[in-house]
């Protein structure tokens, strides 16, 4: 993880650790020597590691975004941001996306009153996300919410009630609230050169 953030910059979904202040400057100095391919590859890797996706999963999302109306890059980011594991992370109900994925896999999370154990579940506006009514589930979420560093930065498409361990999806995310510094067009470009998008 440290190597990844040193090379790619802050990846809040993967870890709360941040690169040392000098490493950004080193990366910029090195970027003068980087090829266009390498720049596109690094943006793609940044996206993949932040959201914790396999190469195949990310490629699938790029294909879905490519078939939808609108900007492929913007739609790609919306698809990734509306995943259940990411929504839990953005709500502060988990400290990282891998941590959120574990909560979902272990059946601690309900969407609209039903257990959902698929981290890639695509959340929709008006979805209500709660924790199972069990002491262990509530204790896990309570710890995450209490120690969450990004509570005050909650994006405007989400609302949380920390006392009821309940999150609400208000709308599809607006691109300015994406939780990662990324040039999504370079990611789309990377894949369009690799495949027939």
From Swiss-Prot:
It is found in: Plastid, Chloroplast. GO terms for cellular component: chloroplast; small ribosomal subunit. It comes from the Eukaryota. Keywords: Chloroplast, Plastid, Ribonucleoprotein, Ribosomal protein, RNA-binding, rRNA-binding. InterPro entries: Ribosomal_uS4, Ribosomal_uS4_bac-type, Ribosomal_uS4_CS, Ribosomal_uS4_N, S4_RNA-bd, S4_RNA-bd_sf. The keyword Transmembrane does not apply. GO terms for molecular function: rRNA binding; structural constituent of ribosome. Pfam families: Ribosomal_S4, S4. The keyword Lipid metabolism does not apply. Residues 82-143 form the S4 RNA-binding domain. Disulfide bonds: none annotated. Its main location: plastid. One of its GO terms (biological process) is ribosomal small subunit biogenesis. One of the primary rRNA binding proteins, it binds directly to 16S rRNA where it nucleates assembly of the body of the 30S subunit. Belongs to the universal ribosomal protein uS4 family. Part of the 30S ribosomal subunit. Contacts protein S5. The interaction surface between S4 and S5 is involved in control of translational fidelity. This is Small ribosomal subunit protein uS4c.
């Amino acid at each position: 993880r440290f190597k990844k953030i040193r090379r790619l910059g802050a990846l809040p979904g993967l870890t709360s650790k941040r690169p040392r202040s000098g490493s950004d400057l080193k990366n910029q100095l090195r970027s003068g020597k980087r090829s266009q391919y390498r720049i596109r590859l690094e943006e793609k890797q940044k996206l993949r590691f932040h959201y914790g996706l396999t190469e195949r999963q990310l490629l699938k999302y790029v294909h879905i975004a490519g078939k939808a109306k609108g900007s492929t890059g913007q739609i790609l980011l919306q698809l990734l941001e509306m995943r259940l594991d990411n929504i839990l992370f953005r709500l502060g109900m988990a400290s990282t996306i891998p941590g959120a994925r574990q909560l979902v896999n272990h059946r601690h999370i309900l969407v609209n009153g039903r257990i959902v154990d698929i981290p890639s579940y695509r959340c929709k506006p008006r979805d209500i996300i709660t924790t199972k009514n069990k002491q262990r589930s509530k204790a896990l979420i309570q710890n995450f919410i209490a120690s969450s560093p990004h509570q005050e930065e909650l994006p405007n498409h989400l609302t949380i009630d920390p006392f009821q361990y309940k999150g609400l999806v208000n709308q599809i995310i607006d691109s300015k609230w994406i939780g990662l510094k990324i040039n999504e067009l370079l990611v789309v470009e990377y894949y369009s050169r690799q495949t027939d998008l």
